[in-house]
Amino acid sequence: MSTDSIEVAIIGAGITGITLALGLLSRGIPVRVYERARDFHEIGAGIGFTPNAEWAMKVVDPRIQAAFKRVATPNASDWFQWVDGFNESGTDPRETEEQLLFKIYLGERGFEGCHRADFLGELARLLPEGVVTFQKALDTVEPAADNSLGQLLRFQDGTTATAHAVIGCDGIRSRVRQILLGEDHPAASAHYSHKYAARGLIPMDRAREALGEDKVATRFMHLGPDAHALTFPVSHGSLLNVVAFVTDPNPWPYADRWTAQGPKEDVTAAFSRFGPTMRTIIDLLPDPIDQWAVFDTYDHPPNTYSRGAVCIAGDAAHAAAPHHGAGAGCGVEDAAVLCAVLDMAAKRVDTAKDGTEGKAALITTAFETYDAVRRERAQWLVESSRVIGNLYEWQDKEVGSDASRCHDEVYWRSHRIWDYDIDAMMRETAEVFEARVAGVAKN
């Protein structure tokens, strides 16, 4: 490993990890990505990106936003519609309408969806060969015996690697988070939010035949008591993505996994009193069905995203319930800031005092800057996502099923995400970094 540059190890080859790797490589910063899976793999489900996330993609590397647009499916309308999935009369969804509760303008081609695997595949094709090493499950991170090598990474297969900086993009069940905070720390693990999601992709021909064109061509949020669902087209309109959420008062039954495939009967029961549109959507989902426990960092948020030369990003730092549809985009914002701080640190390495010690101090300052800029907003997203999930299921004691009050809450919370000024975030990042470097130099 060269000691003339900052070499970075990224743990996790999901969307956040690969986005970050592409951004660092485009800035000339050497990167290795270590992924525990056998290959690039994302769940067979849809994902959406809000306008702020697309802006952040451009900041990281314009090729990333172009890759997303290649696989994104435009909505038939630029308005996101929230409908009453519960109080719908009639029996045939092709002849009935869910009551429109409210709608919010997304902007031109805003909040488009795609298939996760399609997007990750596009990103992977942008990576140079050899950047990602698969079947590498991280065990520990510790300072290397030779200070010039930075951090020593040990993997569960007995192999090792070194890097000056380590970034955990290893998702909700992050090993890097455990290492950074301590395995016994309450925030070392995410916690069950007492909702799970039944996820599935319905061939569009079947969905269109059963529901009618208007109900499958754009993005809908179907609200109701103790359950709700999001539907939108993906894969260039060939599939209807369905995410049906169910409140679950019980503990998640599987200690070793947060996903399970089981009979559809519990999901069917949760939506049994809903209107014909939602009942038909659930009927169209496969049986058995994939169920995903919604874990997040709401109960015990990390009190820092960094320590020394180690930091966490994306779901590893701020796992959020998906009710805002903004978790992955928040990870892209993280990547934009991390690219900036490491780029600024790398440009100072040649003039850093004390050689290796100066490099280590710059990395620490870079990661502390990232923590200072990102943690408040990211944790707000975690908290707001919980609020939104309760609003959609009429569980908020003050709002209940009041559509006007629900709209007001959803509107300001959504726009706080969508309208975030990424350029201002980048200016703040540079200012905080320079101020911290100056403070270190004085000491």
UniProtKB/Swiss-Prot annotation:
Pathway membership, UniProt: Secondary metabolite biosynthesis
Group of enzyme by EC: oxidoreductase
What is the top-level taxon of the source organism? Eukaryota
Which Pfam families does UniProt cross-reference here? FAD_binding_3 (PF01494)
Q: Name one GO molecular function term.
A: FAD binding
Enzyme Commission number, as recorded: 1.-.-.-
Q: Does the keyword Iron apply?
A: no
- Got a GO cellular component term for this one? membrane
Keywords attached to this entry: FAD, Flavoprotein, Glycoprotein, Membrane, Monooxygenase, Oxidoreductase, Transmembrane, Transmembrane helix
Q: What is this protein called?
A: FAD-dependent monooxygenase orf3
The UniProt entry annotates the active site at R199
Q: Which SUPFAM superfamilies match?
A: FAD-linked reductases, C-terminal domain (SSF54373), FAD/NAD(P)-binding domain (SSF51905)
Which gene is the coding source of this polypeptide chain? orf3
Q: Keyword Cytoplasm, does the record have it?
A: no
PANTHER family this protein is in?
Answer: FAD-BINDING DOMAIN-CONTAINING PROTEIN-RELATED, HYDROXYLASE, PUTATIVE (AFU_ORTHOLOGUE AFUA_3G01460)-RELATED
**What does the function comment of this entry state?**
FAD-dependent monooxygenase; part of the gene cluster that mediates the biosynthesis of nigerpyrone and its derivatives carbonarone A and pestalamide A. The biosynthesis pathway begins with the polyketide assembly by epaA to form phenylacetyl triketide precursor from successive condensation of two malonyl-CoA, presumably with one phenylacetyl-CoA starter unit produced by the phenylacetyl-CoA ligase epaB. For the nigerpyrone biosynthesis, the reactive polyketide chain is released as an aldehyde through the R-domain. A nonenzymatic cyclization and dehydration may create nigerpyrone.
Entry's family note:
Belongs to the paxM FAD-dependent monooxygenase family.
Indicate where this protein resides in the cell: Membrane
Q: Which Gene3D superfamilies match?
A: FAD/NAD(P)-binding domain
Its membrane topology is listed as:
Single-pass membrane protein
Q: Which cofactor(s) does the record list? A: FAD
Q: List S-S links within the chain.
A: none
Q: Which residues are glycosylated?
A: N75, N87
Q: Which GO terms describe its biological process?
A: secondary metabolite biosynthetic process
Q: Where does FAD bind?
A: E35, G48, R116, D315, A328
